[in-house]
Curated annotation (Swiss-Prot):
One Gene Ontology term from the biological process aspect of the record: polyamine biosynthetic process
UniProt-listed InterPro entries: Acyl_CoA_acyltransferase, ODC_AZ, ODC_AZ_sf
GO cellular component, one term: nucleus
Subunit structure: Interacts with ODC1 and thereby sterically blocks ODC homodimerization.
Domain of life: Eukaryota
SUPFAM superfamilies per the UniProt record, alphabetical: Acyl-CoA N-acyltransferases (Nat)
Gene Ontology MF: a single term: ornithine decarboxylase inhibitor activity
Keywords, comma-separated and alphabetical: Polyamine biosynthesis
Family statement drawn from the similarity comment of this UniProt entry: Belongs to the ODC antizyme family.
UniProt protein name: Ornithine decarboxylase antizyme 2
Tissue spec. comment: Expressed ubiquitously in 24 hours embryos, with highest levels in telencephalon, lens, retina, cerebellum and hindbrain primordia.
Function: Ornithine decarboxylase (ODC) antizyme protein that negatively regulates ODC activity and intracellular polyamine biosynthesis and uptake in response to increased intracellular polyamine levels. Binds to ODC monomers, inhibiting the assembly of the functional ODC homodimers. Does not target the ODC monomers for degradation, which allows a protein synthesis-independent restoration of ODC activity.
Length: 218
């Protein structure tokens, strides 16, 4: 259960801001994730997409393009398409969605404002029982702990997903720190061949699995 671990997580320093410096990565994996998941939805037995798109395909050897998603890091807002709809909103969290359509899965945008002047956003792809969350390239801003916990609570209570996956490139300089951070939060490394995870050897996935039996009892 997310709430049972909330105090322990909020008391941690896992999401402490690092010193500003060299960016840890140069591109977003959200478009690649969307492309891969769409391909798996269309053909579960094939992990490589044959369609072209703005980002690298999951099984492509092409270099990562400089398509970092602005926003989601407390320093701006992404320009969402006109099809974006508000899915949920309260004092802590606002969730908007880009509905699934031909060639693309459902994309969710999580926005929270832990402090009056700080907007934190997370980008995610929803597919079946899994929510895939992109980890930003920049250091986590103040308030990221509370913001991410709100995301987990929403995923558990409203989306009713079985697992939340965080994903980031394996060649990031802060890879060890990210693995340690999310391991502390209860995430586990995903082994190759997982039914919900695209076959992308250069991307690392970690999963948080909800205890649905305990959730139903509550």
């Amino acid at each position: 259960m997310v709430k049972s671990n909330l105090q322990r997580i909020l008391n941690s320093h896992c999401f402490a801001r690092e010193k500003e410096g060299k960016k840890q990565c140069e591109s977003s994996i959200m478009e690649a994730l969307s492309s891969s998941i769409t391909d798996r939805m269309a053909s579960p037995t094939v992990c490589c997409s044959s369609t072209t798109g703005p980002g690298p395909l999951w099984c492509s050897d092409a270099p990562h393009p400089p398509l970092k998603i602005p926003g989601g890091r407390g320093n701006g807002a992404r320009d969402h398409p006109s099809t974006t709809q508000t899915l949920y909103s309260d004092r802590k969290l606002t969730v908007t969605e880009e509905p699934a359509g031909p060639g693309r899965p459902q994309i969710l945008h999580f926005q929270s404002r832990p402090a009056a002047a700080r907007l934190i956003q997370w980008e995610a792809v929803l597919r079946g029982d899994g929510l895939f969350v992109e980890i930003p390239c920049e250091p986590f801003p103040d308030g990221s702990k509370e913001s991410f916990i709100s995301l987990l609570e929403f995923a558990e209570e409203h989306l009713k997903v079985v697992s939340v996956f965080v994903c980031f490139y394996k060649n990031r300089e802060d890879r060890v720190k990210l693995v340690r951070t999310f391991s502390f939060l209860g995430f586990e490394m995903v082994k190759p061949g997982h039914a919900l995870v695209p076959a992308r050897p250069d991307v690392l996935f970690m999963a948080y699995n909800f205890d649905r039996d305990s959730s139903d009892e509550d």
